[in-house]
């Protein structure tokens, strides 16, 4: 019995254990298609998801990710109301027709109008009385106005409008012809039913590959705890395109039971994790989830494998889960352990449909981590969601709690500042395209199906990195600090 535990032991592989074998190919990197699914019904043009960590993804990151063609998941280590508001901000950031329009009444004092525009970061407000459009007021209208004035004193009353079924080309023509920036949409009774802005149209044209829903809004995911059905309902109502049920060990009887209940209440896609085995994949699939999140302990800030002695090397975990899920058509997201763009190529070749990133995005301008200067270099705070800091600020249901204390499964630290997230994504996608070109994969499915691995030795790994030279500068897609000790 005990001896068999070692005589029948299996072998696990991770990113530094293997390389992909180059193939004869006619595929050029610039021509490959990197679009993929991150859940049953969510397709993105860039197969990268920002992790729902409180030092990685809030609304600014989610907006930047979606604009690039990737997607972000808002973290849940905050009050429900704040997460809901972040989801709403992402959904409002870009849209052809704004349905949930901020409005104001004619009697509103000018000071209140100014405050509302500033807090909502908007330049104008439709003026509504008895649910009917009676005017519009902009920041420009509020300049040099005497105190004590009301909106009715300065608003534009002769408002140019369009019917609610106007098409986008006609709306652009109306905006251009009348030299206006906002076009209210009204029904036959004069009720305000929507708003089209020139800013949103220009932004849409600027980001043609953005991840958008059927209404033209940016797509976003929201993380919820496995037992927080109320939060799941609220973020779905706010517009979340999919939900990530966020727990360290999803193959747990209580979690599985809760997932089945959540499935009955939630209509958007549900991505569940984290898991690391084929059996776990089968268990989650039986709960009718729409995506699988793979990775127990591979992250740079995770100590689960050391503290608990549990985990599966990430490439083996990915391949085992992907094998179990392949007939179901449910996508697999590889979460954790990725340090270079080449690791993304390996993860997909092992069976993943997309990857989830934490540390590689934590140092970007859009991440919410605190900035700091260490030895003259700029860094941003980054911590695991199993760190004491994260656990004590609210995320106690993701990891173990024994008695009155927490069992930490993560650490807190800092990562080098890396600039804007679009610059990082450009390098990562470029590496993915290059890798696909080497192995002759024109699509993500080709890479999953045809990628072949060779196992390498420690000497092979050393040979793979720059050697026999003193580096005097780091290229944007290679950091010396990422090399394993």
Curated annotation (Swiss-Prot):
Species the sequence originates in: Thermoplasma acidophilum (strain ATCC 25905 / DSM 1728 / JCM 9062 / NBRC 15155 / AMRC-C165)
Functional pathway: Purine metabolism; XMP biosynthesis via de novo pathway; XMP from IMP: step 1/1
Cofactor(s) listed in the protein's UniProt record: K(+)
Membrane spanning stretches: none
Signal peptide: none
Location of the CBS domain: 97-154, 155-211
Enzyme class: oxidoreductase
Lineage: Archaea, Methanobacteriati, Thermoplasmatota, Thermoplasmata, Thermoplasmatales
The name this protein goes by in its record: Inosine-5'-monophosphate dehydrogenase
EC number(s) per entry: 1.1.1.205
GO MF terms held by the record: IMP dehydrogenase activity; metal ion binding; nucleotide binding
NCBIfam families tied to this protein: IMP_dehydrog
Regulation of this protein's activity per its record: Mycophenolic acid (MPA) is a non-competitive inhibitor that prevents formation of the closed enzyme conformation by binding to the same site as the amobile flap. In contrast, mizoribine monophosphate (MZP) is a competitive inhibitor that induces the closed conformation. MPA is a potent inhibitor of mammalian IMPDHs but a poor inhibitor of the bacterial enzymes. MZP is a more potent inhibitor of bacterial IMPDH.
Family to which this protein belongs: Belongs to the IMPDH/GMPR family.
Repressor is among the record's keywords: no
Sites where the protein binds NAD(+): 246, 295-297
Record has Metal-binding as a keyword: yes
Pfam families found in the cross-reference section: CBS (PF00571), IMPDH (PF00478)
């Amino acid at each position: 019995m005990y001896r068999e535990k070692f005589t029948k032991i299996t072998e696990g592989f991770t990113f530094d254990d293997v390389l992909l074998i180059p193939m004869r190919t006619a595929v050029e990197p610039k021509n490959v298609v990197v679009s993929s699914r991150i859940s049953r019904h969510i397709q993105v043009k860039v197969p990268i998801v920002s992790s729902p960590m409180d030092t990685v993804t809030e609304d600014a990151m989610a907006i930047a990710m979606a604009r690039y063609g990737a997607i972000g998941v808002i973290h849940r280590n905050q009050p429900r109301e704040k997460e809901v508001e972040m989801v709403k901000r992402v959904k409002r950031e870009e849209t052809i027709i704004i349905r949930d329009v901020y409005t104001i009444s004619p009697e509103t004092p000018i000071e209140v109008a100014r405050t509302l525009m500033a807090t909502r970061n908007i330049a104008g407000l439709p003026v509504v009385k008895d649910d009917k459009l009676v005017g519009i007021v902009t920041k420009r209208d509020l300049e040099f106005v005497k105190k004590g004035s009301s909106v009715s004193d300065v608003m534009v009353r002769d408002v140019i409008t369009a019917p609610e079924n106007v098409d986008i080309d006609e709306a652009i023509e109306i905006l251009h012809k009348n030299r206006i920036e906002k076009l209210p949409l009204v029904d036959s009774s004069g009720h305000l039913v929507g708003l089209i802005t020139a800013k949103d149209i220009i932004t849409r044209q600027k980001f043609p590959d953005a991840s958008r829903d059927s209404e033209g809004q940016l797509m976003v995911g929201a993380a919820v705890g496995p037992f927080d059905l109320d939060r799941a309902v609220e973020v779905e109502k706010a517009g979340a395109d999919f939900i990530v049920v966020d727990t360290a060990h999803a193959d747990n009887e209580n979690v599985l039971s809760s997932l089945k209940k959540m499935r009955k209440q939630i209509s958007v896609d549900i991505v569940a994790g984290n898991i690391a085995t084929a059996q776990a994949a089968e268990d989650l699939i039986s709960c009718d989830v729409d995506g699988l999140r793979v990775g127990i302990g591979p992250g740079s800030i995770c100590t689960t494998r050391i503290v608990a002695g549990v985990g599966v090397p990430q490439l083996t975990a990915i391949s085992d889960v992907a094998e179990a899920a392949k007939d179901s058509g449910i996508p697999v997201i590889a979460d954790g352990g990725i340090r270079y763009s080449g690791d993304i190529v390996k993860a997909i070749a092992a069976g993943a449909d997309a990857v989830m990133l934490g540390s590689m995005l934590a140092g970007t301008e859009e991440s919410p981590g605190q900035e700091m200067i260490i030895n003259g270099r700029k860094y941003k705070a980054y911590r695991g969601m199993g760190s004491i800091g994260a656990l004590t600020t609210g995320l106690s249901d993701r990891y173990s709690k024994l008695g009155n204390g927490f069992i930490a499964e993560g650490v807190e630290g800092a990562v080098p500042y890396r600039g804007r997230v679009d610059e990082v994504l450009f390098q990562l996608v470029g590496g993915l395209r290059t890798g696909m070109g080497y192995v002759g994969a024109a699509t993500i499915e080709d890479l999953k199906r045809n990628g072949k691995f060779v196992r390498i030795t420690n000497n092979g790994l050393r040979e793979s990195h720059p050697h026999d030279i003193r580096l005097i500068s780091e290229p944007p897609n290679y950091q010396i600090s990422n090399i394993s000790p």
